[in-house]
Regions:
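Phosphate/ATP-binding catalytic cores across multiple sugar-kinase/actin-like superfamilies
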Residues: 1-9, 202-209
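Short glycine-rich phosphate-binding loop at a beta-alpha junction
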Residues: 5-14, 101
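Flexible beta->alpha loop and helix N-cap segments adjacent to enzyme active/binding sites
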Residues: 17-18, 22-209
């Protein structure tokens, strides 16, 4: 940025799955610099990049492909017997201390669970992290991530100049003591901010909760 004067910076590669370093970069860049991190920035994203490169180099088209979400995985169906549940029903289950699994539509591309293949739990439970880590067979110090509605993100987290964090690529300082399950030892949390047009069903669930 200093050498080129460029105000638009795009970052990619497996290194940029490191949320701590991403936040460091965000905090130390000038405020007028726009940043974008490719959310599928590991090896699995190379095929997408090569396909786009080939498209633009061979077809010479100016057509753009805006990134609306990263639910590019296979759409699967499971035949199970049960009753349909509303966002209100699921919110009640969470408030009662239950772990809820979400399995809907296409799976997420990349390593982050963003509401289509996710485990949910009440972040207000001070023992929530231990409970989920035990359930997943992980070390007890492993942090949990949080999803927050876009319009309320600044109330709960220090967004350090970011307008949004839809792909869970930053660790942000927690501003409230009401969500201990997602508050790591350094007072940060890996955050997904959520808009309705990104994932309508997941948005409605979080809003109801």
């Amino acid at each position: 940025v200093e050498k080129t004067g460029c105000k638009n910076v795009c970052m990619s590669g497996g290194y940029f799955l490191n949320c701590v370093s991403n936040t460091f970069v965000q905090k130390h860049l000038p405020k007028d610099v726009n940043t974008f991190i490719e959310p599928i920035c590991g090896d699995d994203g190379i095929s997408i990049g090569l396909a786009k490169l080939n498209y633009y180099s061979k077809i010479l088209s100016r057509r753009k492909f805006p990134l609306k979400d990263i639910y590019f995985g296979k759409k699967q169906k499971i035949n199970i017997k049960g009753n349909k549940v509303s966002p209100k029903d699921v919110a009640k289950l969470l408030s009662d201390g239950n772990v809820v699994g979400i399995f809907q539509s296409r799976s997420e591309s990349g390593p982050r669970a963003l509401g289509n293949r996710s485990l949910l739990y009440d972040p207000r439970d001070p023992y929530g992290r231990d409970k989920i880590n035990k359930l997943k067979g992980r070390e007890n110090y492993r942090p949990l991530a949080a999803t927050v509605l876009q319009e309320h993100a600044h109330k709960w987290f220090d967004m350090c100049g970011l307008e949004e964090s839809p792909y869970m690529l930053y660790t942000l300082d927690v501003l409230s003591d009401k969500v201990p399950a997602v508050n790591h030892v350094d007072n940060t949390c890996r955050v997904q901010t959520l808009k309705k047009n990104f994932n309508k069903h997941y948005y409605n669930l979080i809003k109801e909760f």
